[in-house]
Amino acid sequence: VADKVAAAKSVLLLVHGIIGDTDGIVEGLKLATDADGKSVDQKFDLVLTYDYENLSTPISETAVLLKKQLAAAGLHAEDDKRLTLIVHSMGGLVSRWFIEREAGNKVVDHLVMFGTPNVGSPFGKIDAARQLSGVLTTLAINTFPAIAPYGGALVYLLNRSKKISPTLEQMNPTSEFIQTLNASADPGIPYTIVAGDIRDYHESADQLMAKLIAKVGRGIVFDTLYQDAGHDIAVSDDSICGIANDRTPAPTKQNVICHHLNYFVSEAGLKAMAALF
């Protein structure tokens, strides 16, 4: 990896979330194309992925491990590379901790977050976590089989335990982790935030999701969690877009009509990603 990094000028790093791995993001890069047919991955000299244990290891520890692995690969404060991160869900919290608490702002040039719970998620509370993980796993089994085992493992863990996992606990809006992260100084690098909203969801190729929304998404579970606010099932749009606008540069924020698991396959998600590069 270090040899490839040494030969590259522009590097893209992908970081997954609480459910799934980076394979889905990689495929999304290839599907997101500009007017000339050039895909996002083709706009970088090198694409790297960071897969990590995402249930038991505290997010801050994962961020420190990320810093060490990047440095070992030749990505550090003194390098001559342009490093962009595309991250999903909890991967954004890992990346933000690295950038804002571990001097990663000297390494990263641009952070792009999809569905990141920047000020917390209902996943941080056991009852809500059980309900949401059940919905997401049902969706994954029927539409994204490759990531279904990750969701299944999460459901199994939550149903057998009276407590949530350490990483889910850190996503509670009142957790010390969330409070500390959002008290960080301005990192001084561009952040781009993409927030899914299922309220007007109509993806023609995703009939299962339409049925789920009709049965559950507009029912008592989500009404209790989000009231009338926009959300991508797992996270409210207010949380995804919860980074203050008084930073320099101010974070760029946009809403897309998709859910938490199809940012990288839905028409709206792919269009948003293609437009960023």
Please give the residue ranges for each predicted region.
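A conserved amphipathic alpha-helix that caps or lines the catalytic cleft of carbohydrate-
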Residues: 70, 98-99
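Structural motif
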Residues: 9-11, 82-84, 110
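Glycine-rich His-Gly loop
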Residues: 15-17, 88, 116, 196
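Flexible, membrane-associating and regulatory peripheral segments of lipid-active enzymes
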Residues: 1-38, 42-51, 59, 68-74, ...
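Alpha/beta-hydrolase fold nucleophile elbow
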Residues: 77-88
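Gly/Ala-rich beta-loop-alpha elbow adjacent to hydrolase catalytic centers
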Residues: 86-91, 95, 115
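Helical cap/lid subdomain of alpha/beta-hydrolase-fold lipid enzymes
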Residues: 100-277
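Short N-terminal helix/helix-N-cap motif within the alpha/beta-hydrolase-1
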Residues: 22-23, 57, 95, 103, ...
